[in-house]
């Protein structure tokens, strides 16, 4: 997968991201960027508005990296302007610009 292949994802109303093996965001779609209300690129969850939830989020990322298996979970995170929310999440192993990564797609459960 390459950055140019993901342009259609920017039009989708769900959150989509790609993280490198260190947990840094290397691609996010417009919905996630708008929700975060701060620059995400190159940062980890520990540096974001949902930093209190970073340990659990990173644990799920590591499971995918270690096993190579797709993970379907509910994650809990603090979303700026909304407070604590439950997210329905699918994380999967992939490749981005030639490097191993974890991609994810999620939406808030109302």
Mark where each language-model region is.
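Sensory modules in modular signal-transduction proteins
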Residues: 1-25, 30
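PAS/Per-ARNT-Sim sensory domains
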Residues: 49-66
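PAS and related sensory helical modules
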Residues: 33-47
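PAS-family sensory domains
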Residues: 76-82, 95
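PAS and PAS-like sensory modules
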Residues: 60, 71-77, 88
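Short loop/turn elements at sensory-signaling interfaces that couple input to output
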Residues: 89-102, 109
């Amino acid at each position: 997968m390459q950055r140019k292949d993901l342009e259609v994802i920017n039009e989708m109303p769900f959150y989509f991201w790609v993280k490198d093996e260190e947990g840094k965001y290397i691609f996010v779609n417009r919905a996630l960027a708008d929700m975060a209300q701060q620059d995400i690129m190159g940062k980890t969850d520990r540096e974001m508005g949902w930093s209190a939830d970073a340990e659990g989020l990173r644990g799920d990322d590591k499971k995918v990296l270690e096993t190579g298996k797709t993970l379907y979970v509910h994650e809990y995170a603090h979303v700026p302007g909304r407070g604590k929310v439950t997210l329905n999440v699918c994380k999967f192993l992939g490749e981005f610009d030639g490097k191993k990564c974890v991609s994810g797609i999620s939406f808030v459960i109302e």
